[in-house]
């Protein structure tokens, strides 16, 4: 069984994150743990693009980008899948250059 992290950044495309979360929830027999981390900008873009705060409707564990106590912030957390959807160019650039300044980039680094 899988332990999955979904990271949602402030890039345009919140509908993709919403659809992914719906699909993952529907396939919950395929994973043991599903965690979500959203940036502040992701929440604003979601509200703008989708006109709601429906991320609150998903029965999963949410983390803030400053919560470095999240289990997936460490390699010993044994998460096997991380999906960044949508991924902003800023986040992608920080990951590519090894700059870990928040929970998303830290989790991608481990």
Segments and roles (model prediction):
Residues 1-110:
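A cross-family phosphate/adenosyl-ligand binding-site feature
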């Amino acid at each position: 069984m899988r332990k999955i992290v979904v990271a949602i950044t402030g890039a345009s495309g919140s509908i993709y994150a919403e659809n992914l979360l719906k699909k993952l929830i529907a396939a919950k027999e395929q994973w043991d743990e599903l965690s979500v981390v959203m940036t502040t900008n992701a929440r604003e873009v979601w509200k703008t693009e989708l006109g709601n705060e429906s991320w609150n409707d998903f029965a999963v564990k949410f983390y803030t980008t400053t919560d470095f106590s999240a289990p997936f912030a460490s390699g010993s957390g044994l998460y096997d899948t991380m999906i960044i959807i949508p991924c902003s160019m800023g986040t992608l650039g920080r990951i590519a250059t090894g700059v870990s300044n928040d929970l998303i980039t830290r989790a991608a680094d481990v």
